[in-house]
């Protein structure tokens, strides 16, 4: 299974990546609306599902989604990763449901309904599959330095965010 991790930390080949000590939910940019959204997601998580969005390790199924996040998240890197022997997949969901939820932040009934779609693993028109793991292993460093990241993001913006037109995308998709 090919997967991609976007992270600000520097890792080496064969390093194990674990969830961060602090959550993205603890950052200063994580406002009250986002906290409410994550609270509803937590409340709507089906019984028996053991996914913790606050402390889990998010990994993308598609390189194009990893590239998009890398060009948004400053000082980030992209790693091709594989599961360790004892890796646990907690959930696979379409991250776009979370983005859609942001449009209904003041409508708790709609938020609960959309959270159900996320936890059921339903897809949107153009899904962005995120997988929540306990750990993964670095199998390849795709973006490991600021220069490569800057070149990628420059090309990404020149192509108006059209990932499929990026040379970098095709070069790394084939390898």
Where do the protein language model's features map onto the residues?
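Conserved NAD+-utilizing ADP-ribose enzyme module
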Residues: 1-2, 8-30, 55, 67-77, ...
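Short aromatic-glycine-(Arg/Gly/Cys) micro-motifs in beta-strand/loop hairpins
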Residues: 24-52
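A short linear-motif detector with a strong N-terminal bias
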Residues: 36-38, 57-61, 109-111
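Extended catalytic/binding region for NAD+/ADP-ribose chemistry, centered on the ART fold
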Residues: 47-71
């Amino acid at each position: 299974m090919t997967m991609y991790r976007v992270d600000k930390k520097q890792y080496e080949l064969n390093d194990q990546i674990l969830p961060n000590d602090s959550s993205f939910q603890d950052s200063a940019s994580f406002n009250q609306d986002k906290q409410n959204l994550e609270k509803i997601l937590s409340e709507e998580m089906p019984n028996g599902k053991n996914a913790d969005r606050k402390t889990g390790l998010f990994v993308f199924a598609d390189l194009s989604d990893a590239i998009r996040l890398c060009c948004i998240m400053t000082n980030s890197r992209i790693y091709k990763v594989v599961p360790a022997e004892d890796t646990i997949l907690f959930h696979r969901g379409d991250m776009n449901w979370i983005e859609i939820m942001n449009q209904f932040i003041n409508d708790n009934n709609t938020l609960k309904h959309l959270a159900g779609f996320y936890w059921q693993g339903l897809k949107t028109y153009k899904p962005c599959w995120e997988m929540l793991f306990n750990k993964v292993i670095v199998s390849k460093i795709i973006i490991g330095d600021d220069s490569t990241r800057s070149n990628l993001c420059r090309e990404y913006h020149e192509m108006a965010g059209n990932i499929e037109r990026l040379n970098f995308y095709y070069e790394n998709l084939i390898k």
